[in-house]
Amino acid sequence: MLRYVRAAAEDQARIEQFLGQFVDDYLVHEFPRYLTYKTGGIYLANDDDQLVGLSVIALPKPHEAYLGGMRIRPDVQGKGVGEEFAAFQVAEAERLGATVIRALVPRGNDASRSIWEGLGFRVVEEWVVGTIEDFQGPPYGNEVAGPAWAIDRQRIEAFYEQHPRDLWAMPDPWIPQSLTLDDIWGRLEAGGALVAPQEVGQAVDTLALYAINDRDLTVHYIRSMGTHLKALLEYLWVEARAWGVKTLRFGLPRPQADKLKEAAALPVLNEWRGLILEKQVGLSPQPSI
């Protein structure tokens, strides 16, 4: 019988050893920060004293849960461990207060997709994570695009109302969540929102939300309905150069990721493509682990 525990910092070496069974697994580099989560985090599936599976549960919003990174030990795959572990994750997410649960699975992993669909999930979006490096910015940003200001709120609201079900990923490109106006205002106030065109009297046709540090620039959301995406990217390149950054990271829905790649005209490195599956649940209490 499987026993589930929430991983702690002292489990790090054990998790590293477990993930070593999987080739080129991105989770090897990502999992340590999940151990710091106050809610959710990494969950371990144990059969007696043997680690047979792990997964990540995150709550990017109080009512939204993300389930991802499920790994099942190769020798027990196909024996019902994945199904049982996935059912536990749904119950745990619901216990933590989620009413919307999203699972992220790699494209082509039909076994994982089947597990989640068997639990009532349905595919709602394709998701792409990747990096672009060594981009070259122009001397100055294109004046068509630039920072969003408080004066832009009304036309940003009008843009948002056309896409109320959009997803974004902040701060982690692997963890998609719903985008709200409060999210947009938060990035605007932090200096991490761009719009095009910048003319106040014109409708917004391109909006981007981003963050930048001394290592990379991360695009957390971008949507372009017109012809200004390239101009907006040129402004981003100028911003990145000012910080001495030459790496852009992103986690985006596939249509927007494809537009970004086309406008950047640069190869995407470490590209990962997957499916977002979603399920609505109630608020009935579940037993704690």
Where are the language model's segments positioned?
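Active-site rim helix/loop that mediates acceptor-substrate recognition in acyltransferases
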Residues: 19-56, 164-195, 199
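Conserved catalytic-core motifs of GNAT/GCN5-like acyltransferases
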Residues: 59, 104-105, 122-136, 267-280
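Conserved active-site alpha-helix within GNAT-family acetyltransferase domains
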Residues: 83, 107-125, 254-270
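Conserved acetyl-CoA-binding loop-helix of GNAT-fold acetyltransferases
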Residues: 72, 78-92, 114, 118, ...
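Short amphipathic alpha-helix that is part of the acyltransferase structural core
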Residues: 1-29, 136-177
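Conserved beta-strand in the GNAT
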Residues: 44, 50-58, 66, 71, ...
